[in-house]
Amino acid sequence: GNTVAAAMERFHSMVDRRAKREPLQHITGHAPFRYLDLKVGPGVFIPRPETELVVQEGIEWTTRHGMYRAKVVDLCAGSGAIGLAFATEVPGSEVWAVEKSERTAQWTRRNLDETTKRYPAIAGNYHLEIADATQMPTLNQLDGTIDIVLTNPPYVPLSDIPVQPE
């Protein structure tokens, strides 16, 4: 078919979605986060710029304390932004990501798959657990071995999600 007409149709569809306040990142399917390009869409929060500071502080803290093979827990992992950024920026670190929602964990897995294509060394060092971060048995096997816990849990009421500013 006519590629210009198809492109215009796609463009108008995207504009219509944006006019309905759908986040731009969900429309494009991508969200930049530090050095990563994460896949996002319905069912996962878009990583916020302030979350990049969580990663930066975690990297600086573990480095300052000589933890060059840090063991990290990323609670409420969502897209995987925090744990994947840490794993790719701190070689040798090991990350356990905890995500309660199976639907959201599908995005975590997609981003893990994409990230390991660029950073194959992290493949064995990133572990995704589908579990409730607030439950004591979650990650019991790691008791006493973790260097740092990083998290930016969801704090937006579900009723506010469709209209949150992007």
PLM-predicted stretches and their roles:
Residues 79-92:
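Conserved SAM-binding loop of SAM-dependent methyltransferases across substrates and taxa
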Residues 68-78:
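Conserved class I S-adenosyl-L-methionine
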Residues 39, 85, 99:
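Conserved beta-strand segments that form the floor/walls of ligand-binding pockets within enzyme
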Residues 21, 51, 82, 108, ...:
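Residue-level signal for inorganic ion chemistry
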Residues 1-61:
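Conserved AdoMet
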Residues 92-93, 98-166:
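S-adenosylmethionine
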Residues 61, 65-68, 140-144:
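Glycine-rich phosphate-binding loop signature in dinucleotide/nucleotide-binding domains
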Residues 41-42, 78, 152:
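A secondary-structure boundary/capping signal
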